[in-house]
Amino acid sequence: KSSAASDVYKRQNMEQSFQKGVVLHLASLIEYTEGGVISKQLIKSPAGNITLFSFDKGEGLSEHRAPFDALVQVLEGVVNITVNGTLFTVKAGESIVFPANAPHALTAVERFKMLLTMIKE
């Protein structure tokens, strides 16, 4: 949301190669950073991206749009997500799909981790 959070996000954004063909505990593959957001890409391909995120309490992403459908799976914590003007509180173990081009935003109610899957058409 804030420019400070954006700066932390940019510094913490990492592309990392993860071992394939082994069992992964997704939530343990990403840490939290105080006052910030971290992302780690698991898979990046022309067909789409799968990215892990962690958000400290109160951090978030301001309203934006993406040209593709996106699935958010909350791994830990609680997040408020707005999609097309409707507020949803999403908890660990729950998911939500953002339709392509739908305005959406999120704010961490408490620290949370999520897996974002975006399939390109």
Model-derived features: positions:
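Amphipathic, hydrophobic secondary-structure cores in small proteins
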Residues: 60-70
